[in-house]
Amino acid sequence: MIRVAAAGGGTGGHLYPLLAILETLSKDVETKVLFFAVKGKIDEKVVKQEHPEYEVVTLDVRGLFRPLYHPKNFWRAAKVVNAILKAKKELLRFKPDVIVLTGGYISGVVGLAAKNMGVPIFLHEQNVVPGLAVKTVAKYARKIFVSFERTREFLTEWKDRVLFTGCPVRETKEEVDLEDFVLVLGGSLGSDLINSLMEEVYRRISCIRFVHSTGSRRWAERLSVFPNVTAHPYIENMSSFWKKARASISRAGASTIGEMIYYGVPGVLIPWEGSAESHQLENALEAERLGYAIVVREKEATPQKIIEAIDKTMKKGKIEKMKENPATIISREILGEIR
């Protein structure tokens, strides 16, 4: 048995790749998991619901305001110090064999708590441009796994420890009884911009089938009036839809792009330009450069522009699926390092 301490949360983009890694590790070897979650956030809720066998410890932390010298950061920094002390106490009690971190401010807290404990730390960065937490903890990491080759440019100081894997994906054996549709996603909380844009698109297009995860029951009911649209407030078994999708329309969160690339589904990306450190825009532009996507900026997003992008994307056709799930590669690398 190996004892794994893990953190990566605050958003689904950090959480789901981490769960993919942990679930794959548990298939390869017996594990006991200590999971650090952000109090009141998605990681606490999802992990307690889906993995009651994990020991969950919540930390009361929030991300820092930008710029970092923002006056409100004084109070947040005090919370960070308390969270580091709590995390260190829990780590000393749990005695992990390995620590797996996938970004978000809680990863920075746990990484700093563990830096002098002699336990191997493994990082995964989902975004093209590494976040503050990953850059803070990188110097203490045994290996840094990345979703994009270009991320190496931002981690040159630790280039010997960087390994390009892609973004870990949670897979399911479930199948959906649908074929030849466009998958529309707005992220784990939905997107009013995408929902309202697509409502106008649906008024104009009836010859294409859409499956739309809206993020809210209200929007799902509103969009279900269109006969060619299957709308859900939230899709649980996302991978079963990715497997059958012909194209996609979404924000540009790293885990969404990771799924898009893994399953070989070309996409129309509308990056949220308010994301921290312009992560979504950078992710979208890199996916476009690699030939996986067409980027439509928020200020240029009109129903007609989206229709034109859908047409180009569907003509492109599906791309070859990745041969191996990045979660499998990462699990193999971790076990190879600690055995």
Swiss-Prot record:
Coiled coil: none annotated. Its EC number is 2.4.1.227. It comes from the Bacteria. It is found in: Cell inner membrane. Pfam families: Glyco_tran_28_C (PF04101), Glyco_transf_28 (PF03033). Its main location: membrane. GO terms for cellular component: plasma membrane. It is a peripheral membrane protein. One of its GO terms (biological process) is cell wall organization. The keyword Iron does not apply. It catalyses: di-trans,octa-cis-undecaprenyl diphospho-N-acetyl-alpha-D-muramoyl-L-alanyl-D-glutamyl-meso-2,6-diaminopimeloyl-D-alanyl-D-alanine + UDP-N-acetyl-alpha-D-glucosamine = di-trans,octa-cis-undecaprenyl diphospho-[N-acetyl-alpha-D-glucosaminyl-(1->4)]-N-acetyl-alpha-D-muramoyl-L-alanyl-D-glutamyl-meso-2,6-diaminopimeloyl-D-alanyl-D-alanine + UDP + H(+). Keywords: Cell cycle, Cell division, Cell inner membrane, Cell membrane, Cell shape, Cell wall biogenesis/degradation, Glycosyltransferase, Membrane, Peptidoglycan synthesis, Transferase. Signal peptide: none annotated. Cell wall formation. Catalyzes the transfer of a GlcNAc subunit on undecaprenyl-pyrophosphoryl-MurNAc-pentapeptide (lipid intermediate I) to form undecaprenyl-pyrophosphoryl-MurNAc-(pentapeptide)GlcNAc (lipid intermediate II). NCBIfam families: murG. Belongs to the glycosyltransferase 28 family. MurG subfamily. This is UDP-N-acetylglucosamine--N-acetylmuramyl-(pentapeptide) pyrophosphoryl-undecaprenol N-acetylglucosamine transferase.
